[in-house]
A protein has these predicted regions:
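Surface-exposed peri-terminal alpha-helical interaction modules
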Residues: 2-210
């Protein structure tokens, strides 16, 4: 049981360290791409940005001593450019970005010292369930934006492909958390599909840069 719970806690937190940051950034992309007059869409995007920032902060707080060394050193959680990019984005957009979260991530330690701590398991489960709730709303929001943009009823500087792109990432995050909550782990059969998914995502990143 301890090994299964350790895997559940570690995989959940490693997933959150990567994806909550991405979801916060996606909400930021949506927010900055709407015209000033679209206050409803802008306010909703900003709400999601703030909520996922809180979720990221919670994940970082729980992750110390609970995640793998490979993940912390992979560049998936942060890079040498992350803090500087956040500072510049905050300066240019005037949107509050809590840089202290990245600073805390740099101090994270690897390991799993308290895998039998029921309180930790409960906290991770609550975080998973809260993020699933947020993802349901964010996915619906992105789907509505995509529908309105493709119907020429809403202006945004984001290309439809970018909106589809960040929608797929949110759905993958939701799928991973759902499987963790239902099974306690990620089935190995999904590894091939994950590789294919990220190959497509990276190709689209290259298209956006071009």
């Amino acid at each position: 049981v301890c090994r299964k719970m350790k895997k559940y806690v570690t995989t959940s937190l490693e997933t959150h360290l990567f994806f909550t940051r991405s979801m916060r950034e996606h909400a930021l992309f949506l927010l900055t791409a709407f015209p000033a007059g679209e206050t409803g869409y802008r306010n909703k995007a900003d709400w999601f940005r703030a909520q996922f920032e809180k979720a990221l902060e919670q994940a970082v707080w729980l992750a110390d001593g609970m995640v793998g060394e490979e993940v912390l050193c992979s560049g998936e959680v942060f890079t040498e450019f992350t803090e500087m990019a956040e500072q510049q984005t905050r300066r240019l957009t005037k949107i509050p970005i809590d840089i202290r979260i990245t600073q805390a991530e740099k101090k994270l330690h690897a390991g799993c010292e308290i895998c039998q701590d029921r309180r930790m398991i409960q906290q991770v489960r609550r975080l998973n369930q809260n993020v699933l709730y947020l993802l349901n709303g964010l996915i619906a929001f992105k789907e509505k934006i995509l529908q309105e943009v493709t119907a020429c009823n809403l202006y945004t500087v984001n290309y439809p492909l970018l909106i589809e792109h960040i929608l797929r990432e949110a759905k993958l995050y939701h799928q991973i958390l759902t499987e963790l909550e239902e099974k306690g782990c990620m089935p190995s059969k999904n590894l091939k599909n994950a590789e294919l998914f990220w190959n497509q995502i990276m190709m689209e990143h290259a298209l956006f840069i071009r």
